Swiss-Prot record:
Family: Belongs to the Casparian strip membrane proteins (CASP) family.
Coiled-coil segments on the chain, per record: none
Disulfide bonds: none
Residues exposed to the Extracellular side: 55-72, 140-156
Glycosylation positions in this chain: N141
Keywords: Cell membrane, Glycoprotein, Membrane, Transmembrane, Transmembrane helix
Subunit and interaction comment: Homodimer and heterodimers.
Protein name: CASP-like protein UU1
Bilayer disposition of the protein: Multi-pass membrane protein
A Pfam family that the UniProt record links to this protein: CASP_dom
Cytoplasmic topological domain: 1-33, 94-118, 178-183
Length: 183
């Protein structure tokens, strides 16, 4: 009888391996609320920036082609921020454990995408800021006052979105370095 018990325990499943980097990465989203707040700010600022710029693009009837670039970058940044916000909230609600959470590959991808979004936003906002002044949309005769104020608001919100993305990029880079050093 004792021999049959030893045989049955001999084939039991081995205990699940402990992966410190996965456990650490899963704890980021529920122990560090700053990343969730930054994701909310990214989404809100990029949504306002691209919607105001899209309205401005509609009003100038596409005569300034590079405004389309700014709208496209704003849409991509807003979609990325919404996806990251959804995942962050999912981790917070679920209470991500060691078996279900983020992986180091996800952390690398997040860092790279945060960096790309940051640089695309700053390039689009700065190109639009100089283009608005050079193209004469904000004319000195006062004819483009409404267009000028909307373009200034859009560029301002794009710069605010840039700041939120850059702060998030710094945080994800910090967490990535800590993860690499722990592993």
């Amino acid at each position: 009888m004792e021999e049959s018990q030893q045989q049955s325990t001999k084939f039991d499943a081995p205990p699940s391996p402990y992966v410190p980097s996965r456990v650490y990465l899963a704890q980021i989203y529920w122990k560090k609320p700053a990343i969730v707040v930054l994701r909310v700010l990214q989404f809100v600022f990029s949504l306002i920036a691209f919607s105001v710029m899209a309205d401005l693009l509609h009003d100038v009837q596409g005569s300034i082609k590079s405004l389309s670039y700014t709208v496209a970058i704003g849409v991509l940044a807003c979609a990325y921020a919404l996806a990251q916000l959804s995942f962050s909230l999912w981790c917070v609600i679920r209470g991500a454990t060691s078996s279900s959470g983020v992986t180091p590959l996800y952390q690398y991808a997040t860092f790279i995408c945060d960096q790309m979004s940051t640089y695309f936003l700053i390039s689009a906002a700065s190109a639009t800021a100089t283009l608005i002044d050079v193209s004469g949309v904000c004319g000195s005769n006062g004819s483009g006052t409404n267009l000028c104020s909307r373009s200034t608001a859009s560029v301002t919100f794009a710069f605010l979105a840039f700041l939120a993305f850059s702060a998030s990029s710094v945080l994800t880079g910090y967490y990535l370095v800590k993860c690499i050093l722990k592993a």
